[in-house]
Curated annotation (Swiss-Prot):
<keyword id="KW-0489">Methyltransferase</keyword>
<feature type="binding site">
    <location>
        <position position="188"/>
    </location>
    <ligand>
        <name>S-adenosyl-L-methionine</name>
    </ligand>
</feature>
<feature type="binding site">
    <location>
        <position position="114"/>
    </location>
    <ligand>
        <name>S-adenosyl-L-methionine</name>
    </ligand>
</feature>
<feature type="binding site">
    <location>
        <position position="59"/>
    </location>
    <ligand>
        <name>S-adenosyl-L-methionine</name>
    </ligand>
</feature>
<dbReference type="InterPro" id="IPR015915">
    <property type="entry name" value="Kelch-typ_b-propeller"/>
</dbReference>
<comment type="function">
    <text>Probable S-adenosyl-L-methionine-dependent methyltransferase that acts as a component of the wybutosine biosynthesis pathway. Wybutosine is a hyper modified guanosine with a tricyclic base found at the 3'-position adjacent to the anticodon of eukaryotic phenylalanine tRNA. May methylate the carboxyl group of leucine residues to form alpha-leucine ester residues.</text>
</comment>
<dbReference type="GO" id="GO:0005737">
    <property type="term" value="C:cytoplasm"/>
</dbReference>
<feature type="binding site">
    <location>
        <position position="89"/>
    </location>
    <ligand>
        <name>S-adenosyl-L-methionine</name>
    </ligand>
</feature>
<feature type="compositionally biased region" description="Basic and acidic residues">
    <location>
        <begin position="1"/>
        <end position="10"/>
    </location>
</feature>
<dbReference type="GO" id="GO:0031591">
    <property type="term" value="P:wybutosine biosynthetic process"/>
</dbReference>
<feature type="region of interest" description="Disordered">
    <location>
        <begin position="1"/>
        <end position="21"/>
    </location>
</feature>
<keyword id="KW-0819">tRNA processing</keyword>
<dbReference type="Pfam" id="PF04072">
    <property type="entry name" value="LCM"/>
</dbReference>
<dbReference type="GO" id="GO:0008175">
    <property type="term" value="F:tRNA methyltransferase activity"/>
</dbReference>
<dbReference type="Pfam" id="PF24681">
    <property type="entry name" value="Kelch_KLHDC2_KLHL20_DRC7"/>
</dbReference>
<comment type="similarity">
    <text>Belongs to the methyltransferase superfamily. LCMT family.</text>
</comment>
<comment type="pathway">
    <text>tRNA modification; wybutosine-tRNA(Phe) biosynthesis.</text>
</comment>
Amino acid sequence: MGPRSRERRAGAVQNTNDSSALSKRSLAARGYVQDPFAALLVPGAARRAPLIHRGYYVRARAVRHCVRAFLEQIGAPQAALRAQILSLGAGFDSLYFRLKTAGRLARAAVWEVDFPDVARRKAERIGETPELCALTGPFERGEPASALCFESADYCILGLDLRQLQRVEEALGAAGLDAASPTLLLAEAVLTYLEPESAAALIAWAAQRFPNALFVVYEQMRPQDAFGQFMLQHFRQLNSPLHGLERFPDVEAQRRRFLQAGWTACGAVDMNEFYHCFLPAEERRRVENIEPFDEFEEWHLKCAHYFILAASRGDTLSHTLVFPSSEAFPRVNPASPSGVFPASVVSSEGQVPNLKRYGHASVFLSPDVILSAGGFGEQEGRHCRVSQFHLLSRDCDSEWKGSQIGSCGTGVQWDGRLYHTMTRLSESRVLVLGGRLSPVSPALGVLQLHFFKSEDNNTEDLKVTITKAGRKDDSTLCCWRHSTTEVSCQNQEYLFVYGGRSVVEPVLSDWHFLHVGTMAWVRIPVEGEVPEARHSHSACTWQGGALIAGGLGASEEPLNSVLFLRPISCGFLWESVDIQPPITPRYSHTAHVLNGKLLLVGGIWIHSSSFPGVTVINLTTGLSSEYQIDTTYVPWPLMLHNHTSILLPEEQQLLLLGGGGNCFSFGTYFNPHTVTLDLSSLSAGQ
């Protein structure tokens, strides 16, 4: 890489600091953390989305956890030396000011290193802000050619390139850093921006230079799955590519990396584990109630793709003080794959409107016509709640073709709902239940979609009108992320609506029965233990009842239970399905029953370092097995959450429609085309 290319890339990395600083300011402004200094250090303001807030919150709490563990250990009465904090790539972070205000720097000092331009700008900002100068005390500013940009009794800011370690060591020594003193080295999203050889040299240099130290690292991992690929693509487009992820893709590889570089002990956890194990339940509830939130999939994916690591040298700094082992977050890794389901793109769909949306619903209108409605996606060149309906149809040549239609007439129009359910009542009628317009606005009313074909019976000329169903004052369903399943009791057909969430309740445990013939809500006795509340679960019709699998529970942790609402003489009975081996907890998946087997497709899980494929459960024996999805012939990342799926039992295929989400700060991703899964190996293995 030439000098000019290095300079351009360094500039791009510095730009990530500016964006991060604004996110931290927004985080504090919304009350996630107490940090009055973020607004003083960062000019301007930006209101970030709730998902960004949560991501930066867990990052801030993880770093705070490590810093406090270090200071509490070094601050013990027997400690003789002053503690040192060396923040690498510190940017405009306010750590020094927060520690100074909290009285935690009585026997400690802070050094910060960043690119010269960033360091000078921060030093200037501090110097012109009286509130900050009052905390630093008397200070000096370095000469323009000097690495030292700011110096007070317990705070130094240096402008240095971390790739030039000899100069870094000399400048730190001149600024008073004592390598023999207990030292916390902090690198938040820093090492991954360095070329692999530079990052390796920095880790080894720190191990050799500081005999009594703790090295805390926060950065990205898991580049292999669809979210990881999209994350890598985002940073490449910013001209700040992430390095080293292929060689060190997970926490185990990162542990080995530091141990082999000379660190004596190392512990690391991903951010899902940190959030659930190292934050008190009361604090989690506080954060979860700060502002409306409904992007659980991307929140858990973001946390699965970042880790916090603490590597130590010396007897007084043990990594177990930072991340003690916990049984509160057991790892539940799936069994070794029993087979593979090949995936392929529906080829003929590429020349027609694509189904680029998520949070929608899909249903068969007829054996050769699939309707998808609602969700968030692309429409007329912008991202929005989609109002057009998508049809996937095929002729006698068995090639699927897509088309889009809008509602006709001047009556009821599609209201833009998502996370609703759709049930086919006939070839010309579809029932729409629940959904939301936003996390604080449920979609009101039950809708019926009525379809009319043209005189030549051309599916592409299908017309749709929308009517309100049920009573105008019916407020039974103000929920979303629920399920609707066709069940039967005493020769009567019902729709069983279960779970979900609402504006008032973050997770629901209740259910309702809708009589199909009269479109009236009825009460039917249900016996057995009431299941744990959940949303984003799956539900399938089976033997007149409903199979409920997985979901997200009240603690925002995925569930692994499979339940059967079994018909009995007087109504229904809840039963638990015993599964061996137990399945990995998951949610936001889809499910189907094929030849006495329950298929759980895709979804989100947080208790395993792998990513979900298809779990197959034999409903007779209770035995479960795992199948990988081979995406060799899918030329783009395939995200299997917020999607829908349609089973083609005769062809032994599964159609995967839509899916994706708002992927943290990396942008919104939609699966661009419909994908087919070949399930024939499942029948071959019978």
